[in-house]
Design a protein with these regions (language model features):
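Carbohydrate-active catalytic/glycan-binding domains of CAZyme proteins
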Residues: 12-216
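Bacterial Sec-dependent N-terminal signal peptides
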Residues: 1-15
């Protein structure tokens, strides 16, 4: 595509693991027009702890061969972010032809970026966090689920799980932030919400540390 020329795309052959030349984590897949868009976090290799400044994108049409599109967004995408670390686990969803990237900035809440293309460029429509509970650092690992009736929800949090009802514009919400009264046993972080055959499922990073995968 034209975007590949600008981003200097690289072809990545299918191997295990898929990504071998960069330190990536928190893969967030989205299927759109028969293509898997895999958004990831990116950890630099010159620090002992987390040093995460941007988000990357990989795509595949066969789940075997992958194209590296490089950096799709970064902390610099948010003018209100003054730190150079903390680009944690993101997720991108599509609605009405637009693509919304929900980005936690560790210690600064959750921001949202919008694009007309899943390849970007992603821009900040708010100029401020979508969610920021300043009394703690729980606001990480957002996931967005759109139910069959069109209502969108955003879930997030560590060690508690919260949610809000997103408005149709996907960049604002109605009502209060709700903390789940009964957090699933061993819930730690990284919620993902699904619906199948009339049942709702919450998958999450479980226990710590190391973490496993749990569901409820």
């Amino acid at each position: 595509t034209g975007g590949c020329g600008l981003l200097n795309c690289l072809n990545v052959n299918a191997q295990r693991p898929i990504i071998q030349t960069k330190y990536t984590a928190d893969p967030a897949p989205m299927v759109y027009n028969d293509t898997v868009f895999l958004y990831t976090t990116h950890d630099e290799d010159d620090a002992e702890g987390f040093k995460m400044q941007d988000w990357l994108l990989y795509t595949s049409t066969d789940m075997v061969n992958w194209t590296d599109h490089g950096v799709v967004a970064s902390l610099k995408s948010f003018d209100w972010v003054k730190r150079d670390n903390g680009a944690w686990a993101e997720q991108v969803v599509e609605r009405n032809g637009k693509f919304y990237m929900y980005c936690p900035i560790h210690g600064n809440g959750i921001g949202v970026l919008v694009s007309d293309s899943p390849y970007g460029p992603f821009k900040d429509p708010l100029g401020k966090p979508l969610v920021w509970q300043k009394e703690h650092w729980d606001d990480i690992d957002p996931t967005v689920f759109i139910d069959e009736d069109g209502q969108a929800y955003m879930y997030w949090g560590n060690p508690n799980c919260y949610y809000v009802k997103l408005n149709e514009d996907m960049i604002s919400y109605s009502g209060d932030i709700v903390k789940l009264k009964e957090t699933p046993e061993h819930y730690q972080e990284g919620p993902w919400f699904y619906k199948r055959n009339g049942h709702y499922y919450l998958a999450f990073a479980s226990t710590c540390c190391p973490e496993g995968i749990g569901y409820a």
